[in-house]
């Protein structure tokens, strides 16, 4: 199965759907779904996902290179792995999504969206994770969902972690730093993301990794993400990565800006970078007689997008943690 990406983009079903690799077995589970199981017993399970948004291609290319290294035998596998290319149709079309944003649908939220390929795919992915994590004796569960951002950022690589009732494990956060993430953002409320679903329902240590800016296939400079790729290779092989000399800055979400109607106005232009700082009292958005202002001494914006559909998030406001 050394042509997983090509098969996914073409929508083709392989003639052979399972086989042997270098020290592992593989099974094609469906379009964009590939399970890898080491020959030796392991108690660690890892979801590696990318392409939830079809225009975010750099992580997909990164996973393709990791798979090639595994199949060639130059990389040893020490985890059970489920590789997920989230939205095959949008990936093939080179667009963010075909009908609706899938990363708002998980945890059963797809039921509140108009039925589409994305709602069906979200349900399929939920079932796939359930099956994967239910198989075998699993002591450690991780989920790394690889993305790129729509706009530029003051932090080239950063992670977004879902709301979690338990403390985050230190080795997981340390690995994220070793993977080159310059900042970590901690959600304080539940959401419809893929990583929140895996964390809430399966207790996985989950993170959305944002790696640079969204570009078409073939236009990505993967050398920007070599530290992340090297950390993923080490993780798969069971090799401990060295701790980053500069731990990631930490932020938490303090509010969400939501667009409710066509009267919504977000006072940030297309050049506003992720993690841009705003002083207390700054007017961020208006909608009718409702005004959204900065309430802390300094807040930082993440994912500003005035063009989202009504009812969806138009941005997150963050505060720095000590």
From Swiss-Prot:
Q: Carries keyword Metal-binding?
A: yes
Residues binding Zn(2+) are 53, 56, 147
One annotated GO biological process? arginine catabolic process to succinate
**What cofactor does this chain's UniProt record say it requires?**
Zn(2+)
What are the EC numbers? 3.5.1.96
| A GO term, aspect molecular function | zinc ion binding
Give one Pfam family, short name only: AstE_AspA_hybrid
Pathway per its UniProt entry is: Amino-acid degradation; L-arginine degradation via AST pathway; L-glutamate and succinate from L-arginine: step 5/5
By its UniProt entry, which PANTHER family does this protein fall under? Answer: ASPARTOACYLASE (PTHR15162), SUCCINYLGLUTAMATE DESUCCINYLASE (PTHR15162:SF7)
What is the designated name of this protein?
Answer: Succinylglutamate desuccinylase
Q: What organism is the protein native to?
A: Salmonella choleraesuis (strain SC-B67)
